[in-house]
UniProtKB/Swiss-Prot annotation:
It is found in: Secreted. Its cofactor is Zn(2+). Keywords: Hydrolase, Metal-binding, Metalloprotease, Protease, Secreted, Signal, Zinc. Its EC number is 3.4.24.-. The active site is at 334. GO terms for biological process: proteolysis. InterPro entries: Dictomallein (IPR051256), Peptidase_M66_dom (IPR019503). This is Dictomallein-like protein. Binds 1 zinc ion per subunit.
């Protein structure tokens, strides 16, 4: 019986590409089978009374069944025998288009949707093939014989299964699609307005940058194109970061410097690190959130009212941190990096891989997409209405892949951001492979619990379960694995730069930003128990609770914050210029102003005291080998950098 189930599924899967019009299937994509990962089975006696009523009729014979959310998938989803790949499956709690084709002519049909206990949830009339959704750019239809219906999101839960009933027939075999659990992604937009950027000298409205142009139509398309139950594009809790200058770190051949115009060649250099620190300090780096910083950088040497200097974008792969010029194509490209995606072109050619299955970083071999917001399919071929419909040679080093008829395939957004879509489409189409990798990234992150005061992670059964983070490795890397410990509280975000070499203008506090949100844990520098917890002396064999907190790179500085009501807060600044695991030994080049070892950067998200008084003064205190100091010594330490507000 097990063998026959698998054989039936493989027969169905083998015909899906012909139904979809995709004529290049020489990929390493495989169709999954098995009882728990999407299956086609014969009816049992528990299905439903509806099915028992027509049991005397001949069963409906299906040629294929597919499901579409962001992509059109076989019941078992898709997987790849490649390094670092994911599994692309349907997700719970999302409207799902079901597509059915038959072995014989039918006049009418319905799909019956059941829960995991075989209780009927919905009976949906299937629309005729003539009513199938169109294709982006008025391209060729996905199918000329597929019947379709939309399964509502409430019905899409673990164990859901369907049976199709053609007029005059009994129900088909049971089809059980593989489902990932409910997966959500939040994309946070944090505009960086630098060197005097304002609405008089930039080409965009700041309110639009705060949500990356996500009006209802754009937000709907963003959700539709991502393989998640929900995708939110929102303004970051910090709102906007504004500064008339940036501090560029030492380059190795030149010292740190204060940059005050985008005319400087290092005009955008510090931003990505700043975004990374924001992700880290707020605790977002552990969660299902990414941050994109649309950056407006003013070049004061430019004539005319608009003085922004253009550039591309950057991200730390898999970190959740990204930045770039404000465009939806770059949001998808740099956001893709933040979600763990490398460049598709290099991934397809990497001799250690490949890490991307389709030639030249293209969509040749990828499944069709489906945009439920626009109500159309998206072919892996370049849309006829694209300016790249007629394509020759290469694009950015990637050779255009073509069908035998000369049609060009799109490149994945991780190679070419947005040129091959219909002009009315907001976002490019990700390959099925990269969609699966993004699902894997989100499945490996925690999410906030429903009350927004704790966390959930996926357990071994694939269900969301409550999770309490613990500190590992004596806090050598993080306390409580850099999960937030305060939630939705009034908080001040503070960034500090400091040159150990005394480089002019390189030691600064950026203006603090008050926001309402989350923050990770910091050590109180004037609490004796806190100081004891980070004691890095392990010579006796005994270890403090957080003994490696300072052992990795030292703890030599303290942040002091004074509020308008006279109250103060002191926090240990983790990280200095000490040698790894030698917290009392300076690095060799710590006084060389051209060396990166001479430059320190910290970010702290500090919960405001009761009553939320405003910050009045910021100070960087000199507290070498901090764990050996007393609270009194910390409070009396010299201030190296002071900012009055």
């Amino acid at each position: 019986m097990k063998l026959s189930m698998v054989m039936v599924l493989l027969v169905l899967a083998g015909q899906l590409s012909g139904c979809g019009g995709n004529d290049d299937n020489n990929s390493e994509r495989t169709h999954e089978s098995g009882d728990s990962n999407g299956d086609v089975t014969t009816p049992d006696n528990d299905a439903s009374s509806n099915d028992e009523d027509d049991a005397a009729l001949e069963p409906t014979q299906l040629r294929s069944v597919e499901f579409a959310q962001s992509h059109v998938l076989p019941p078992g989803g898709l997987s790849w025998d490649l390094k670092e790949s994911g599994e692309l499956q349907l997700v719970e709690k999302r409207d799902t288009l079901v597509l059915a084709t038959f072995d014989e002519a039918v006049q009418a049909a319905e799909v019956r949707v059941y829960d995991k206990n075989h209780q009927l949830l919905s009976s949906l009339n299937l629309s005729k093939p003539s009513d199938l959704p169109p294709t982006e750019g008025d391209d060729l239809p996905y199918s000329d014989d597929a019947w379709s219906a939309v399964i509502p999101s409430d019905d899409m839960s673990k164990g859901v299964n369907i049976r199709v009933v053609a007029q005059g027939k009994s129900a088909s075999e049971i089809v059980t699609p593989a489902l990932h659990p409910e997966l959500d992604l939040t994309i946070q937009s944090l505009p960086f307005l630098i060197y005097g950027a304002n609405e008089s000298n930039i080409p965009f409205k700041i309110d639009d940058l705060k949500v990356m142009f996500a009006d209802p139509d754009t937000a709907g398309q963003g959700f539709a194109g991502m393989p998640f139950s929900k995708t939110h594009i929102v303004n970051h809790p910090l709102g906007v970061f504004e500064s008339d200058y940036l501090i560029a770190p030492p380059s190795g051949s030149a010292p740190a410097k204060k940059v005050e115009s985008a005319a400087d060649p290092d005009y955008s250099k510090p931003i990505l690190d700043m975004v990374w620190h924001i992700e880290y300090a707020t605790g977002d780096m552990a969660l299902n959130k990414i941050t994109f910083a649309p950056s407006m950088l003013i070049d004061h040497s430019k004539a005319g009212p608009i003085k922004t200097r253009g550039f591309g974008g950057m991200a730390y792969t898999g970190s959740g941190a990204s930045m770039g010029y404000p465009s939806l194509g770059l949001l998808w490209h740099e956001g893709g990096h933040a979600l763990g995606l490398p460049h598709s072109l290099s991934g397809s050619k990497d001799l250690r891989g490949p890490y991307y299955p389709y030639a030249e970083g293209s969509l040749s071999g990828s499944a069709w997409g489906y945009d439920q917001h626009k109500g159309y399919f998206r072919s892996p071929l370049t849309a006829p209405t694209s300016r790249y419909f007629v394509c020759n040679g290469e694009r950015g080093g990637g050779v255009f892949q073509k069908t035998p008829e000369g049609r060009c395939y799109r490149f994945d957004p991780m190679h070419s951001a947005d040129e091959q879509k219909d002009p009315d489409a907001a976002f490019p189409l990700f390959s099925d492979f990269n969609a699966g990798k993004m699902q894997r990234w989100v499945r490996n992150r925690a999410r906030m619990n429903p009350s927004n005061d704790g966390f959930q992670v996926l357990d071994d059964n694939g269900d969301w379960a409550d999770f309490v983070p613990e500190t590992k490795h004596y806090a050598g890397w993080h306390i409580k694995e850099h999960y937030p410990v305060s939630f939705d509280k009034t908080t001040d975000f503070i960034m500090i730069t400091y040159s150990l070499a005394g480089t002019d203008a390189a030691s600064h506090f950026y203006n603090p930003i008050r926001y309402k949100g989350n923050a990770i844990e910091y050590v109180d520098a004037i609490n004796q128990d806190g100081l004891n917890s980070i004691n890095a002396d392990i010579s006796s064999g005994a270890r403090a609770k957080y003994s490696d907190y300072c052992r990795r790179q030292g703890c030599d500085f303290t942040l002091k914050v004074t509020y308008e009501d006279g109250s103060t807060s002191y926090r240990v600044l983790k990280g200095s210029a000490r040698k790894d695991w030698q917290p009392s030994v300076w690095k060799d080049d710590y006084l060389n102003e051209n060396s990166k070892d001479s430059y320190l950067f910290w970010a702290v998200a500090l919960v405001a005291p009761d009553g939320a008084p405003k910050v009045k003064k910021l100070e960087l205190l000199d507290t070498p080998i901090l764990w050996n100091l007393s609270p009194t010594a910390v409070m009396g330490a010299e201030a190296l950098v002071v900012k009055q507000l």
